[in-house]
């Protein structure tokens, strides 16, 4: 159905935009990176398929690590090697520091204040990014909030211990991360585990909103390829995102208003959370910070923090259950270091090299964002001898880099051992492993995500033995994914925990 809509709209668009069918800047094809042949009007759109990260990886085998495509009216360059990723994110980082903002998310004023959508040269971006980096994700800030994370891990272990049969692992990790973000930001919890009688309609709606936002933001949008159709919202993405993002903004707005009213009371005692600190900053002289900026920042943090770490932990459990020998190695290491403690402390992580290797291998094998957030060229520049015109959209295919046999031995195999006794990490300096990006736009929440990934995987593996639900043992079935802003499992992992 989507293909028919696409072709019909492309035919209509041809009547309006045919006059502009030429290469960017009028240059000859020889100046631009190589790429596959294009159909009239729609270009290479049909070659993306349902899994663009895999389709682009296949095309890169023919056209190389710097490949050009035409997606409707958009000129796109796809980066598929560590060397070219370094050129884009580091050497030419300022030129490519502007994010591509899909038309469907240019709603509710979000694009005007969201640190995910503003260029790195924006004063607002610099201000909000600095606040997040220093006040929430710095080592000092994270040390101060370690008890909040420890309590969420305890609740996760308690919930799994209560399960008498197969449980939805991804739902449990999502609940853990969502509650962590709300406890850190607002000193409240928003969701309950599946066995709770208090799982209200509001809680279910919250899950629906976050899942819908990450799903719809990853859907290729005809209105982006042919901006002439933007007012008509042909796929309904703008309408859907307005509802789901608007609902989250309303939820956060209500929490902020409650706090503002409480702060006016003579008997008010300050909360030890991020919102309290932000409101204090908004009333001081150091930052010109508005309540509207606080609201949109909190929504950005909730969406990013709730979804990707939860999905990556679910993928980790998938691979460990499919590889019992790897799970046994991890459990033995945890037993030798942690002993009989049920909760793994963040200070234990540095003593657990196989746990660290397992997390790295999961991030390689199942990168949370298979295509890193796309960038735009602020000006014409050169990469590897090719012209990259101004306003070119840049995709970095992290999935391709992570599966490249010239970089990784046996890339299609899950082998944590490949990361033992080497210094490769995912902090943005080793471009063969950049699941969180690199350079100016590296994910600011990386330090928090790293702590929670290690601790959630360790908590689930140390306290329990696991069995896959009967009938779900197929590796092919378990590894099926759904493309989006985050790479989700197509079928949720259901597994049976057995208390050790």
From Swiss-Prot:
Keywords of the record: Heme, Iron, Membrane, Metal-binding, Monooxygenase, Oxidoreductase, Transmembrane, Transmembrane helix
EC number of the protein: 1.14.14.61, 1.14.14.-
Binding site for heme: 443
Residues that span the membrane, as ranges: 4-24
Localization per record: Membrane
CDD domains associated with the record: CYP76-like
Enzymatic reactions: 11-hydroxyferruginol + 3 reduced [NADPH--hemoprotein reductase] + 3 O2 = carnosate + 3 oxidized [NADPH--hemoprotein reductase] + 4 H2O + 4 H(+); miltiradiene + 2 reduced [NADPH--hemoprotein reductase] + 2 O2 = miltiradien-20-al + 2 oxidized [NADPH--hemoprotein reductase] + 3 H2O + 2 H(+); ferruginol + 3 reduced [NADPH--hemoprotein reductase] + 3 O2 = pisiferate + 3 oxidized [NADPH--hemoprotein reductase] + 4 H2O + 4 H(+)
Family: Belongs to the cytochrome P450 family.
Protein name per UniProt: Carnosic acid synthase
């Amino acid at each position: 159905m989507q293909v028919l809509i696409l072709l019909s709209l492309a035919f209509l668009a041809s009547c309006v935009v045919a006059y502009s069918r030429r290469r960017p800047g009028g240059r000859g094809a020889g100046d631009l990176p190589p790429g596959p042949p294009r159909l009239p009007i729609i270009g290479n759109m049909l070659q993306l398929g349902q899994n663009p990260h895999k389709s682009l990886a296949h095309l890169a085998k023919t056209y190389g690590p710097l490949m050009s495509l035409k997606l409707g009216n958009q000129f796109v360059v796809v980066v598929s090697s560590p060397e070219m990723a370094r050129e884009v994110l580091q050497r030419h980082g300022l030129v490519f520091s502007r994010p591509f903002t899909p038309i469907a998310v240019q709603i509710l004023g979000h694009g005007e204040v969201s640190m995910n959508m503003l260029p790195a040269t924006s004063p607002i971006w610099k201000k909000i990014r600095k606040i997040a980096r220093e006040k929430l994700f710095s080592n000092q800030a994270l040390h101060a909030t370690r008890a909040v994370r420890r309590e969420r891990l305890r609740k996760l272990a308690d919930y799994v211990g209560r399960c008498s049969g197969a449980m939805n692992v991804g739902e449990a990790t999502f609940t853990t991360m969502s509650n962590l973000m709300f406890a850190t930001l607002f000193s409240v919890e928003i969701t309950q585990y599946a066995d709770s009688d208090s799982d209200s309609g509001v809680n279910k709606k919250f899950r629906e909103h976050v899942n819908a936002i990450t799903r719809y933001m990853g859907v290729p949008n005809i209105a982006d390829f042919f901006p002439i159709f933007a007012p008509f919202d042909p796929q309904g993405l703008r309408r859907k995102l307005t509802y789901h993002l608007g609902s989250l903004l309303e939820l956060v707005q209500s929490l902020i208003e409650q706090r503002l009213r409480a702060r006016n009371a003579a008997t008010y005692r300050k909360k030890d959370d991020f919102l309290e600190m932000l409101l204090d900053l908004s009333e001081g002289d150091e930052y010109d910070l508005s309540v509207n900026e606080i609201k949109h920042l909190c929504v950005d943090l909730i969406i990013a923090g709730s979804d990707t770490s939860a999905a990556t932990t679910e993928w980790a459990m998938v691979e460990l259950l499919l590889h019992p020998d790897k799970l046994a190695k991890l459990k033995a290491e945890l037993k030798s270091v942690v002993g009989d403690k049920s909760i793994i402390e963040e200070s234990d992580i540095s003593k657990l090299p196989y746990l660290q290797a397992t997390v790295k291998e999961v991030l390689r094998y199942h990168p949370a964002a298979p295509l890193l957030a796309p960038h735009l060229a602020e000006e014409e520049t050169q990469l590897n001898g090719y012209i990259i015109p101004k306003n070119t959209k840049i995709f970095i295919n992290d999935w391709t880099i992570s599966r490249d046999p010239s970089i990784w031995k046996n890339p299609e195999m899950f082998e944590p051992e490949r990361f033992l006794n080497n210094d490769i990490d995912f902090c943005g300096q080793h471009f063969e492993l950049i699941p969180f990006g690199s350079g100016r736009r590296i994910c600011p929440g990386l330090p928090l995500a790293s702590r929670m990934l290690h601790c959630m995987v360790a908590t689930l593996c140390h306290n329990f033995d696991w069995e896959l639900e009967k009938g779900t043992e197929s590796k092919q079935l378990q590894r099926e994914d759904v493309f989006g802003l985050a790479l989700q499992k197509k079928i949720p992992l259901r597994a049976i925990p057995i208390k050790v």
